[in-house]
UniProtKB/Swiss-Prot annotation:
<keyword id="KW-0554">One-carbon metabolism</keyword>
<dbReference type="Pfam" id="PF00763">
    <property type="entry name" value="THF_DHG_CYH"/>
</dbReference>
<keyword id="KW-0378">Hydrolase</keyword>
<dbReference type="GO" id="GO:0009086">
    <property type="term" value="P:methionine biosynthetic process"/>
</dbReference>
<dbReference type="GO" id="GO:0005829">
    <property type="term" value="C:cytosol"/>
</dbReference>
<dbReference type="GO" id="GO:0004477">
    <property type="term" value="F:methenyltetrahydrofolate cyclohydrolase activity"/>
</dbReference>
<keyword id="KW-0486">Methionine biosynthesis</keyword>
<dbReference type="GO" id="GO:0006164">
    <property type="term" value="P:purine nucleotide biosynthetic process"/>
</dbReference>
<protein>
    <recommendedName>
        <fullName>Bifunctional protein FolD</fullName>
        <ecNumber>1.5.1.5</ecNumber>
        <ecNumber>3.5.4.9</ecNumber>
    </recommendedName>
</protein>
<comment type="subunit">
    <text>Homodimer.</text>
</comment>
<keyword id="KW-0028">Amino-acid biosynthesis</keyword>
<dbReference type="GO" id="GO:0000105">
    <property type="term" value="P:L-histidine biosynthetic process"/>
</dbReference>
<dbReference type="InterPro" id="IPR000672">
    <property type="entry name" value="THF_DH/CycHdrlase"/>
</dbReference>
<dbReference type="InterPro" id="IPR020631">
    <property type="entry name" value="THF_DH/CycHdrlase_NAD-bd_dom"/>
</dbReference>
<comment type="pathway">
    <text>One-carbon metabolism; tetrahydrofolate interconversion.</text>
</comment>
<dbReference type="InterPro" id="IPR020867">
    <property type="entry name" value="THF_DH/CycHdrlase_CS"/>
</dbReference>
<keyword id="KW-0521">NADP</keyword>
Length: 293
């Protein structure tokens, strides 16, 4: 039976650490860290995600600044809102909640965020820093995966890693982080032919393709570490990921569950990025080096 990569439990442990470290740093900084989440429109799923992030902030002592614009907000109105948050000294991290309503172009909006306040690690400058191996905010989901692997003593160095999916949100930064950890990395995607022959080479397999249960037992070699980034609602109810957990549990060495795997760690790494930005701004030295990816 596969080792359970329990992101929910790890996230809870890390929240306690973050809370303790924030309390140590408040005297030097003069205030708590601040995270601003900018939400456009009334997408129900986005509203739930934002509430979860606000609750996580409250648990660890990060001040949360919610900002909400209507679905018909113009590109210029969103740019103005971002610029106001850039100038707000209370704010250390800014997150633009995706996806955006139709008619808005996310690329220039993400580029408008102050790179030093980029809580999601998606600014072009920070993606470039990742590519060059320089310090900076990291994309939250792949960073969460790396911390999960580290927590279980799973070292990617020298291993064959396969990432299924090439999005700028997960797949591409995931591949770069694994490569930086000295894995030999292959990226597969929707145009990849003979996917099984590629995924079966993996000692570490990260699936972020956005297709429900697309990876089954035939796709892996026994003993593979499998990280499932996908999350989907089944027509009959309940949630599933991009892998068929029932098939993989008997053959994988380790497997992240859905829900309770990568999702909670994504939120935690958003908090980590915000707290680290707060530390840099106020020259606060905290014991968080093991959370830097």
């Amino acid at each position: 039976m596969a080792l359970r990569l329990d992101g929910k439990q790890l996230a809870a442990q890390l929240e306690v650490r973050l809370q303790q470290q924030i309390q140590k740093g408040i005297a030097a900084a003069g205030r708590s860290p601040g995270l601003a989440v900018l939400r456009i429109g009334d997408d129900p799923a986005s509203a739930v995600y934002v509430r979860n992030k606000e609750k996580a902030c409250a648990r660890i002592g990060v001040e949360s600044f919610g900002s909400h614009l209507p679905a018909d907000a113009s590109q210029q109105e969103v740019l103005t809102a971002i610029r106001e948050l850039n100038a707000d000294d209370r704010v250390d991290g800014i997150l633009l909640q995706l996806p955006l309503p139709e008619g808005l172009d996310e690329t220039p909006l993400l580029a408008e965020i102050d790179p030093n306040k980029d809580a999601d690690g998606l600014h072009t400058l920070n993606l470039g820093r990742l590519l060059k191996g320089e310090q900076g905010p990291r994309s939250c989901t792949p960073a969460g995966v790396m911390v999960m692997l580290r927590d279980q003593g799973i070292d990617p160095a020298g291993k064959r890693a396969v990432v299924v999916g090439r999005s700028i949100l997960v797949g591409q930064p995931m591949a770069l982080m694994l490569q930086a950890a000295n894995a030999t990395v292959t990226v597969a995607h929707s145009r990849t032919q003979h996917l099984e022959s590629i995924t079966r080479q993996a000692e570490i397999l990260v699936v972020a393709a956005g297709r429900p249960e697309m990876i089954g037992a035939d796709h892996i070699t026994p003993g593979c570490v499998v990280v499932d980034v996908g999350i989907h609602r089944r027509p009959e109810g309940g949630l599933c990921g991009d892998v068929c957990a029932e098939e993989l549990e008997p053959v994988a060495a380790a497997l992240s569950p859905v829900p309770g795997g990568v999702g909670p760690m994504t939120v935690t790494m958003l908090l980590v990025n915000t707290v680290l930005a707060w530390c840099r701004r106020h020259q606060v030295a905290l014991e968080l080096s093991d959370l830097v990816v």
